[in-house]
Regions:
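N-terminal Sec-pathway targeting helices
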Residues: 1-13
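Hydrophobic alpha-helical membrane-insertion segments, chiefly the h-region
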Residues: 14-24
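Right-handed parallel beta-helix/beta-spiral solenoid domain characteristic of secreted/periplasmic
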Residues: 59-62, 83, 96-139
Length: 292
């Protein structure tokens, strides 16, 4: 009887241990704390009834062009894009434009480059929000910013968009949150020469580099699920760029696992030199914090 009880106890401990291990390896991507460097509202469009927004709202439905809505918009306008497939590149060179995908019955609007177009969404205005889109099959970039400040890029699914998935450059005060990216041949999320950027609660996988902070300052990277890339998290200085330094970067509470994917970066590119199996790479950057 004692032998049976011992066996039972051992089996019970094993089962509990396996259960604890399973839950311990489940990434927690829903922090209750406010962003650290980004200053502004991170309220999601899903927090309100997006279809009841009437004032300053332009609607785009399948068969329409999103770019025509941008051309009509004035600063402060909301552009609602309904589910459907849109084959175009969208340029936003105005301030304070909120571009929301409307999710209906689980379906989102899709920007499809058909392996012919270079970029999906390019913005240079300040106060830009881009939320709730599927972006796929572009040759260059999914979402790229050029000197746009006070931006929010949130809850987008970006697949197979060539060089970069999300790429703000020369921007200040930005939030990149709750996005899902894969199949990117350089960096899925690439923060280039920016200041005061929070990168939170994203999932990046099956890309060459997961999240890359290059020549940027005051950046927080936290609560991200970074898995099955060639390299996971990176912070470094690339010589020869207008901004020469990279410092005050915090990597915190990220779940980085199994970054052993084959490096399929373009020959001659910087990321092509990242060894497969790299979880965290810090090169020539200063004041980098890695915790939890």
């Amino acid at each position: 009887m004692k032998t049976i009880m011992k066996i039972f106890v051992v089996l019970l401990v094993l089962v509990v241990g396996i259960g604890i291990g399973k839950f311990a390896l489940t990434p927690e991507l829903k922090p209750n704390i406010a962003p650290t460097f980004f200053e502004g509202s991170s309220q999601s469009s899903s927090d309100k009834n997006i279809e009841r927004l009437e004032e300053n709202t332009i609607e785009v439905r399948e068969g329409d062009l999103i770019q025509e809505a941008v051309a009509k918009a004035i600063p402060g306008d909301i552009i609602l894009v309904y589910p459907g497939t849109y084959y175009e590149t969208v340029y936003i060179d105005k301030d304070d434009i909120r571009l929301y995908g409307v999710i209906k019955n689980g379906k989102r609007p899709t920007l499809d480059g058909k392996k012919e177009l270079n970029d999906a969404i390019l913005y240079s205005g300040n106060g830009i929000t881009i939320e709730n889109f599927i972006i796929k099959n572009y040759k260059g970039n999914g979402i790229m910013g050029q000197a746009g400040n006070n931006f929010v890029i949130k809850n987008n699914w970006i697949y197979d968009t060539g060089v970069y998935g999300i790429f703000p450059q020369f921007g200040k005060n930005g939030l990149v949150e709750l996005n899902r990216l894969s199949g990117i041949e350089d960096a899925a999320i690439y923060i280039g020469m920016c200041d005061n950027i929070d990168v939170r609660t994203n999932e990046v996988y099956e890309s060459v580099a997961g999240i890359e902070i290059e020549n940027s300052r005051h950046c927080l990277v936290e609560y991200n699920y970074v898995h099955d890339n060639a390299g996971g998290l990176l912070a470094f200085i690339t010589p020869g760029l207008p901004i020469k330094d990279c410092y005050d970067v915090i990597f915190r509470n990220n779940f980085v696992i199994n970054n052993n994917h084959k490096n399929f970066g373009a020959p001659g590119s910087v990321v092509a030199t990242i060894p497969s199996g790299t979880g965290l790479l810090i090169l020539a950057a200063d004041q980098i914090t890695v915790e939890d």
